[in-house]
Amino acid sequence: MNILAPVRRDRVLAELPQCLKKEAALHVRKDFHPRVTCACQEHRTGTVGFKISKVIVVGDLSVGKTCLINRFCKDTFDKNYKATIGVDFEMERFEVLGVPFSLQLWDTAGQERFKCIASTYYRGAQAIIIVFNLNDVASLEHSKQWLADALKENDPSNVLLFLVGSKKDLSTPAQYSLMEKDALKVAQEIKAEYWSVSSLTGENVREFFFRVAALTFEANVLAELEKSGSRHIGDVVRINSDDKNLYLTASKKKATCCP
């Protein structure tokens, strides 16, 4: 018996959501990896549809982690600030290329006294979202330490990284432009995909989480194909900050069908 909630109509992905900035993206292709598309069409995605992929959200106190998750999952925004104690999580169900896919979004505390508690839940993440306040330079500077802490419990080669600037609605165009330049540099340094959002207005929130779901799904299917004996895992999802071509290709052969 399937105990998971049914997929909502607004959580169905038939195509790959695009990145926000090509200069800081995990990859810039317009479509899903050909082998992923083929595997979905042939119903050869293995156990991907039954797995729950863990996504952890980290960052300084009051940068807007909870508001970001609540805006996407519940379409709400609470102006009354309440600090997260320890950890909390939300489950989101998607359908990607006809395959059910689940994300578990872990909202972690940014307070120092809860850091030890929160860090125990970092392990097993398939994606790490580092949130900073677009109006607070210090929160951006701290993002590298948050990443370092999260990677202590995870294999860096097996997680997707996202750097998200929050509270865009509070920034003037001039302020945002300056902060974005710094944020893009950090994103390139840590090999993360950059996004800017506003949980108050909802700007880019839905697009961002759809992108997270799609790329996590893609990585899961490619891993499943590799596990099942595929000879070529395809494209490696990582930024190459030393090359204009941000998408590193493990194999330049165009796959037309799954082996």
UniProtKB/Swiss-Prot annotation:
Keywords: Acetylation, Cell projection, Cilium biogenesis/degradation, Cytoplasm, Cytoplasmic vesicle, Cytoskeleton, Golgi apparatus, GTP-binding, Hydrolase, Lipoprotein, Magnesium, Membrane, Metal-binding, Nucleotide-binding, Phosphoprotein, Prenylation, Protein transport, Transport. GO terms for cellular component: centriole; centrosome; cilium; cytoplasmic vesicle; early endosome; Golgi apparatus; Golgi cisterna; Golgi stack. GTP binds at S62, V63, G64, K65, T66, D78, Y81, T84, G110, K167, D169, S198. Mg(2+) binds at T66, T84, D107. GO terms for biological process: antigen processing and presentation; cellular response to glucose stimulus; cilium assembly; cytosolic ciliogenesis; endocytosis; Golgi to plasma membrane protein transport; lysosomal transport; lysosome localization. SMART domains: RAB, RAN, RAS, RHO. It is found in: Cytoplasm; Golgi apparatus; Cytoplasmic vesicle, Phagosome; Cytoplasmic vesicle, Phagosome membrane. The modification Phosphoserine is found at S241. Pfam families: Ras (PF00071). A motif (Switch 2) lies at residues 108-127. A motif (Switch 1) lies at residues 71-89. Regulated by guanine nucleotide exchange factors (GEFs) which promote the exchange of bound GDP for free GTP. Regulated by GTPase activating proteins (GAPs) which increase the GTP hydrolysis activity. Inhibited by GDP dissociation inhibitors (GDIs). It catalyses: GTP + H2O = GDP + phosphate + H(+). Its EC number is 3.6.5.2. A lipid is attached at C257, C258 (S-geranylgeranyl cysteine). CDD domains: Rab36_Rab34. The keyword Lipoprotein applies. It is a lipid-anchor. GO terms for molecular function: GTP binding; GTP-dependent protein binding; GTPase activity; guanyl nucleotide binding; small GTPase binding. The small GTPases Rab are key regulators of intracellular membrane trafficking, from the formation of transport vesicles to their fusion with membranes. Rabs cycle between an inactive GDP-bound form and an active GTP-bound form that is able to recruit to membranes different sets of downstream effectors directly responsible for vesicle formation, movement, tethering and fusion. RAB34 transports protein involved in the redistribution of lysosomes to the peri-Golgi region. Plays a role in the maturation of phagosomes that engulf pathogens, such as S.aureus and M.tuberculosis. Belongs to the small GTPase superfamily. Rab family. Interacts with RILP. The GTP-bound form interacts with REP15. This is Ras-related protein Rab-34. It comes from Rattus norvegicus.
